[in-house]
Amino acid sequence: MKASDIRQKFLTFFETKGHTVVRSSPLVPGNDPTLLFTNSGMVQFKDVFLGTDKRPYVRAASVQRCLRAGGKHNDLENVGYTARHHTFFEMLGNWSFGDYFKRDALVWAWELLTQEYKLPADKLWATVYQTDDEAYDIWTKVIGLPPERVVRIGDNKGAPYASDNFWQMAETGPCGPCSEIFYDHGPEIWGGPPGSPEADGDRYIEIWNNVFMQFDRQLDPQTGEYTLTPLPAPCVDTGMGMERLAAILQHVHSNYEIDLFQALVSAAARETNTKDLANNSLRVIADHIRACAFLIVDGVIPGNEGRGYVLRRIIRRAIRHGYKLGCRAAFFHKLVDDLVKEMGEAYPELREARDRVVDVLRTEEARFFETIEHGMSILDGALGELKAAGKDEKQRMLDGELAFKLHDTYGFPLDLTQDVCRENDVIVDEAAFDAAMNRQREQARAAGKFKMAAGTLDYTGDKTTFHGYDQLLSETSRVTALFVDGASVPEMRPGQTGVVVLDHTPFYAESGGQVGDQGTLKAATVWFDVADTQKVLPEVFGHQGTLRTGVLKVGDAVGAEVDAVRRARTMRNHSATHLMHKALREVLGAHVQQKGSLVDADKTRFDFSHNTPMTPLQIREVEARVNAEILANASTNAQMMGFDDAVKSGAMALFGEKYGDEVRVLTIGSSKELCGGTHVARTGDIGLFKIVGESGVAAGIRRVEAITGDNVLHYLQTLDTRIGEAAAALRAQPSELTQRIVQVQDQVKSLEKELERLKSKLAASQGDELVSQAVDVAGIKVLAAKLDGADAKTLRETMDKLKDKLKTAAIVLGSVSDGKVALIAGVTADATARIKAGELVNFVAQQVGGKGGGRPDMAQAGGTEPDKLPQALAGVTAWVQQKV
């Protein structure tokens, strides 16, 4: 059974069991700073399990793309060398949110495996938590699995409920026992059944884990022990590795032998011209193309930090393995079409992003191939020296400073260097590497404004109702919580800065790139200045600011009023951002995707995927398209609809954003996006749009800054004033300014040429005058002189003329400009055996606070102490006498 059939059969089976088939979420978790990447199928349902979100369904099934490469899930060194380690993998999963529980979950799992996938029943084993009699009885009495093939697993991780068969999301919160299903590959493969001392072998392989969240785990402050309280609505969370299941169904032992991987391994062999299809490097490359391609699909760009650096590490590891196979030019990006062929039907977004993926990989390959050969030469040389030293394998350690140099200068991620060292039985001195890294890392931290990251304030009250789309004033909002210095307080006093949570508010909390509102909260004697509005929790708004007068208490009623002028300017910029995004895609191409934005009252700053700087013509075209939309004065429409319906209607969803099942669709002009921000009523309200900056912020990421409305008027008035001042300075009309500037530039060029001619003439005359100052030392004419006003070029020209005239000579010339010393030394060819120009110039340079170098016949230097130059030059003759 092919991998594509395995996916579809899983989804179809659970659809017949009343499950809603849910699309895979991106590899970048939306609005979850605790996770680097989506690493399991349950990630997109985390808020449901925590009770902070609800879905219109109680049963779900999906095939989730996952990535484990970083943090505690960093198995990168094993990928390609074991049968089942991967960076990217697919997780088949089904979920129940307070609906069915253990019996249905296990019975359906058994039915799917034995009746649909046709796995031999006598090859399957199960494990349960040691006290989970319910699951044990379902396996043995309902399903009929022999008791000897159902293993109870206890607390095997050193603490109560710390077990392979007891799952918990965190130290406290939802948790419960789990039941794992194993497949027995047969006695010809070493290993023992689960729970036995030989369980780490490859004979018995876990294929499906069924987690039963039925308890709330909390710490008893009196006893210091954890307690388990039954949840009112138990849930089911299951996960089965698609690649492991495919290996079983296709009768192979290694995941790399399934049809999907065999196609990618063959493609890697083709591009690297490798005959041995069992080569581990081919497996590394085949694994990594999946991870890299889908990371790029989901909006990650290679960079030097965070997710971008993980992507860069994986790309460069693949390139290094290609280099190991003999590749000396870019090859990795050529595998994208093979991947699209294998996985494009299951993931249409991969096919749609094909050109962008190829472009990003090609660019990153070109960058690394510029340095990999030199870096590998240095690393191979160091490894050769370690081996030649004859040290015991356990004592072979690569200098951490060298590893850092490879990282800093040649772009070798540490784990790439460790990979190469591991192949040569050498370890890297990580402590020294870390020390070098820390020395380089900047210590200064910007004092940013107060921010409330989700979950940093201990709030347990009701959600905030937001009604700020159509009104900016609430006369009867009630205070539900107060926080000062991060702690909950019953009241706030004048002068204190803190956070106010209201039951309903017109204040927009920062989200989607739009800054939070400012304004005031007022009561009879209370005046609270709101400096910012942030989300305490996904649907709880915190008004951060300072209490000016009165005493504010929890339960008080206040009037909440948004700064209308600031909000209006912010709305103009936000609406213009949508129109600009649409125009950028039309002008530059459909590969343009939003990578970040900041919308405030002054400007909109928009980061997007694009590899080259925008041309002036492209900028003008984007401006023209946006302003045409503004002049059309089209009305803005916002409506709520299901996510799938929204996407089908043509609304653009942004990668990396987390959307619920019901979303707000904003139509403004020809733009249609999912957006929860505040916007103008009509496009004409924007007034005018102007791009004021375009730059690169990272590889493959461009940034545009733009302004709208009265900010454009102020910008144009300021520009007009500056043009007028420039015209007056050049004694021209503004309309003649370009022509006048060209004339001035021509005059400057002419004067520069005349200046060069005069300097050359001066050098010649000075050279004639200096010849007579030369002193004969053992047949060498020695001359040391200072040339006032001479630049480096004049010094060189004078030096050449003096060498011609003096024949056998050693000469030092110096000059001073802007407090800096410039030196040049020249020695004729027939004297270099006795005097070296480099030594001569350094003799002088060291006395004036500098150093230099060069060839035996010509050398240059600089210095920072011009007052010492005359004395230094005066000692040249004596120095030459000592040398000869």
Curated annotation (Swiss-Prot):
Supply the alphabetized keyword list: Aminoacyl-tRNA synthetase, ATP-binding, Cytoplasm, Ligase, Metal-binding, Nucleotide-binding, Protein biosynthesis, RNA-binding, tRNA-binding, Zinc
Pfam families membership: DHHA1 (PF02272), tRNA-synt_2c (PF01411), tRNA_SAD (PF07973)
Domain of life according to the entry? Bacteria
Indicate the principal place this protein occupies in or around the cell. cytoplasm
Q: Which residues bind Zn(2+)?
A: H574, H578, C675, H679
Which locations, inside or outside the cell, does it occupy?
A: Cytoplasm
What EC identifiers does the entry list? 6.1.1.7
Task: Name the cofactor(s) required for activity, per the record.
Answer: Zn(2+)
Gene Ontology MF terms: alanine-tRNA ligase activity; aminoacyl-tRNA deacylase activity; ATP binding; tRNA binding; zinc ion binding
> Which reactions appear under catalytic activity for this entry?
tRNA(Ala) + L-alanine + ATP = L-alanyl-tRNA(Ala) + AMP + diphosphate
Q: What does the cofactor section's free text say about binding?
A: Binds 1 zinc ion per subunit.
Question: A GO term (biological process) for this protein?
Answer: alanyl-tRNA aminoacylation
One of the record's GO cellular component terms: cytosol
EC category:
ligase
Among InterPro entries, the record links this protein to: aa-tRNA-synth_II/BPL/LPL, Ala-tRNA-lgiase_IIc, Ala-tRNA-ligase_IIc_anticod-bd, Ala-tRNA-synth_IIc_core, Ala-tRNA-synth_IIc_N, Ala-tRNA_ligase, Ala_tRNA_ligase_euk/bac, DHHA1_dom
- Can you quote the domain comment? Consists of three domains; the N-terminal catalytic domain, the editing domain and the C-terminal C-Ala domain. The editing domain removes incorrectly charged amino acids, while the C-Ala domain, along with tRNA(Ala), serves as a bridge to cooperatively bring together the editing and aminoacylation centers thus stimulating deacylation of misacylated tRNAs.
Q: What does this protein do?
A: Catalyzes the attachment of alanine to tRNA(Ala) in a two-step reaction: alanine is first activated by ATP to form Ala-AMP and then transferred to the acceptor end of tRNA(Ala). Also edits incorrectly charged Ser-tRNA(Ala) and Gly-tRNA(Ala) via its editing domain.
Recorded family membership: Belongs to the class-II aminoacyl-tRNA synthetase family.
Give the protein name, as stated in the record: Alanine--tRNA ligase
